[in-house]
Amino acid sequence: MNLFLTGIPKRIFASFLCLVQVLFFTVSPFGTPSALAAGKGVNVIIMIGDGLGWEAARAAATAKTGKWYTSGKGEGLAMQTLTGYTYATTYGTTVGGATGGTALTGTNAITGKSPVIPGFQFNPAFNAGTPVRKAEATASVACRNGAGTTSNGGNIVGYEPSKGGPNPWTPLSPAVAAAQGFNPEYIKCSYPDSANTATTLYTGVKSYNNATGVDLYEQNSETILETANKLGKSTGLVTSVPITHATPGAATSHVNRRSKYDSDYPVLDSILQQAIRKDLPDPYSPDRKDIKPFMPTVLLGGGHPLDFQNATNQTTTQPSGDGYVYIKPSTYNQLKYNPSNPYGYTFLERDGNVTYTNDLSKIKDGGAELLKTAAKLDPNKGDRLLGLYGARGQNGNLPIATANGDYSSTGLDNFAVYSSAGSSAATTNGTQIPKPDTVRPLANGIDNGRGETAAQFIAKERKANPTLAQMTQAALTMLNKDKDGFWLMVEGGDIDWGIHDNNIDNIIGNTIAFDNAVKTTIDWVAKNGGWDKNVLIVTADHDHYITLNDTFPRLLAANGAESLTYTQHTPATAGHFFGSEPTLKYGWGSHTNRMVPVYYQGKKLNLAKYIGKTVDYVDAVPGGKSTKYQLPGVANAVDQSHIYKAMLEALKA
């Protein structure tokens, strides 16, 4: 692939860089220039199921095969066929009693422009907070955390297996946690988010909730995507949710708040502008003159602005003014209408004709178009591909498959709004009735006034949008043309949305859709160099508090996931619950600090050497001295920073 505007031939540039060791966390030598020139570069692929903890994976595996397991890797999913298995800690930092704050004052909203909090001195002690039992069925924070309410004032959340459990399946249920010596409230304390965990996976740096590609002081941390660029490798990001969400965003931006999705040109303090601007660094930037090009070779995912607000009777192929949440109108219009825009991407998008016709033959097949385009483009010629998709009414996400694959949730809002505890008006230990969205944004004026049925809506949205597996295949097809190798991240982001909404139907469907993409990748590896040439890691960014009872397989088989979601309102009849209260179906609606599964394979991946090892943390005070600390590891587990190190080594092998 061409390296931006340098004019330097790729292999010469890559060979030069391979002589220089520039990263702090380097633990193995660079690959030799001759190996790269011979096309022997390793392909490193990480696939992240957002929120895909051990229990969510078990739910999907059980739904798919009917088999039940109570410990270990399990079976039934493609990811569980990978030979390597461990689990990872996911914790981040905490300042002043909050996990979402930096060590800066926040007086200037621009990333890194605020001064350090007066008197702040980093303390490497663990500080998860003090667990407090809450029986109420809410997703309120269950812990008093931070320096204001604990004695040590530490700035690392940490993970203590003596409190949370030595692995993701111990304790198997909060109902037995106390009897086994664990605290069922502990994993609620100071839980991480997708931004800081992705930052750790891509940079090796632990940071605060909201951070994308920056450290505790909002300083830039080089991402593995940037490193791959320097090595002359192609790069890709694929997601089932908006392309400017935290998991893809942390690989392609240095931003202090994950909600900075996009900005109008030439402002650069946003995820999308940093990701796709090619004319960087920009000496005329009003805010971020420090940003260099990220420019992923392939960027595919959701966030299309068509009808974000779930409004009814949408009758135009053009997005409404309220729809531009994940991408600005100026950016969208440049990509769509201006071939000489400042971004340099071949641009594909979902078909908007769905609001004009019910004739399925007139709807562009988004998956087929994407695969055909990817086959034509060549990163060695400087080609780049950006595909923007998302179903109407779903906050920019791809169509939701549901557990039985009927896509009956497509077009319905599904993120911590309707069936979660916070919206169910539950009383302590009382029966909770979910309130799911039932109104799709149907185009009521089309087809001579007959409008659009739910079945027509679903069929058209499915055709207009590729699946995650198709996007993964397209990315692999295009990136594989770079014989120097590539780095690729694929995210099943909507798994997290289903769990936030306490919706077992969507959890299972989204996980299986993600696993289909994993199978696509495994099959591709077998035909393209095998495990000598390719490395695959499948993991989660963080966990959620979901528990499956022993009755779950029987109840799922008898009733189906849709019934367990919408008509069975107690743990006894639904076979599962959310949170630390076994008698409440909806006792929580957010993440936990529990360890997450890691499935992996590839001869160039030496992740096993990090199992049980300490965790490096560098306190890099702006303009001052950097101090390196070693934090305690967990027996039989790795940390997400170790996954970064192992990927980096494989990338340079």
Predicted regions and their residues:
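A post-motif C-terminal structural segment
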Residues: 41-44, 49-192, 197-199, 240, ...
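Anion (oxyanion) recognition and catalysis
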Residues: 229
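Hydrophobic core
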Residues: 17-25, 29
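Boundary at the C-terminal end of the N-terminal hydrophobic targeting segment
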Residues: 35-39
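His/Cys-centered metal/cofactor-coordination and adjacent catalytic loops
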Residues: 207-210, 214-218
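N-terminal secretory signal peptides that target proteins for export/translocation
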Residues: 1-9
